[in-house]
């Protein structure tokens, strides 16, 4: 072998690693105008989002302070809403109770069914059924609220008589399910309608979470002799726990703020009823929608004050969800 071949076969001598200054210069040189524009747009979008949130909170807080400062009752605990007298007396106790009760009913009904549907689609349903069922669920998620409200008022409410009669006959002694034979435009009807509305939302998110379960986890459980249900219980559900919580909080957010469907179905009555079957009650969103157009300037400030409370509740719910997900992340294996 000649000398030229030997020189070609020799490895190049090692070079010293670049210094910190050289790395910074290289980074600046590699940043092209398009990268700088994209970085600026991305950063500006994030700042704009925070600015919009701050502007909404500031507007609500300012208008709410104008009303609360003149309220002659306790805004948080009063059971009346009368902004047309001097001094005005109004409070949100009835609205908070109705909003929480209807949302809890919706979550209790929707979450187990949604998780069951998601598990069926990802682990039990035949391939030929998955696509049609998934399409129907996606379609239900896209139905406008007013359509749900009209369906609830014209179809669901008339069908509640039988259910309410059965509950009153067998569970009326509890007081919660007693019925005075009035129109079934009650909190239970609203909760059932809200459950139907949030069901596709929770189902879609849970389905996508369950699809992300590593195949090796399920195969390992099957190799140990686990049944299909044991695989779901020991591998799928622990992995998707945080995702299901996120899906539930997303559905809860819609239930808390739902307006038109509730206003169409519920018979408004600014009072708290022990029974879930008797008509009456109210929610934050329903009260704002039904009174805002006819309210005076001060009355609108009072309604905005109730909207501020709903805004804070929504933030607290999402914050609690993030905290729960963060605590369970190490056990579930899913990304928060």
Map each language-model feature to its residues.
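Transmembrane alpha-helical segments of polytopic membrane transport and secretion proteins
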Residues: 1-46, 321-336
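Hydrophobic alpha-helical transmembrane segments of multipass integral membrane proteins
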Residues: 97, 101-109, 113, 117, ...
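Transmembrane alpha-helices
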Residues: 136-139, 143, 202-209, 213, ...
């Amino acid at each position: 072998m000649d000398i030229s071949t030997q020189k070609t076969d020799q490895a190049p001598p090692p070079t010293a690693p670049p210094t910190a200054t050289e790395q910074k210069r290289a980074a600046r040189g590699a940043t092209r105008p398009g990268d700088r524009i994209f970085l600026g747009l991305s950063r500006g979008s994030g700042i704009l989002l925070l600015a919009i949130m701050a502007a909404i909170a500031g507007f609500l807080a300012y208008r709410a302070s104008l009303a609360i400062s003149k309220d002659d009752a306790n805004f948080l605990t009063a059971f009346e809403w009368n902004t047309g007298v001097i001094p005005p007396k109004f409070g949100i106790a009835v609205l908070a109770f109705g909003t929480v009760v209807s949302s809890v009913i919706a979550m209790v009904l929707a979450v187990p069914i949604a998780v069951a549907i998601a598990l069926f689609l990802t682990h039990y349903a035949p391939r030929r059924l998955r696509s049609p069922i998934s399409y129907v669920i996606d379609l239900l998620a896209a139905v406008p609220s007013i359509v749900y409200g009209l369906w609830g008022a014209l179809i669901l409410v008339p069908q509640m008589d039988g259910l309410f009669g059965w509950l009153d006959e067998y569970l009326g002694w509890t007081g919660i399910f007693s019925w005075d034979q009035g129109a079934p435009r009650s909190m239970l009807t609203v909760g059932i309608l809200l459950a139907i509305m949030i069901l596709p939302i929770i189902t879609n998110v849970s389905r996508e979470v369950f699809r992300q379960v590593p195949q090796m986890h399920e195969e390992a459980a099957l190799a140990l002799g686990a049944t299909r249900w044991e695989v779901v219980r020991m591998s799928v559900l622990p992995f998707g726990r945080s995702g299901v919580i996120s899906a539930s909080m997303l559905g809860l957010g819609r239930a808390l703020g739902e307006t038109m469907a509730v206003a169409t179905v519920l018979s408004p009555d600014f009072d708290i009823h022990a029974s879930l079957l008797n008509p009456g009650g109210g929610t934050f969103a329903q009260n704002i929608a039904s009174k805002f157009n006819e309210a005076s300037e001060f009355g609108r400030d009072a309604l905005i004050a109730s909207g501020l409370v709903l805004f804070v509740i929504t933030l607290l719910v999402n914050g609690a969800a993030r905290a729960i997900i963060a605590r369970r992340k190490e056990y579930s294996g899913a990304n928060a």
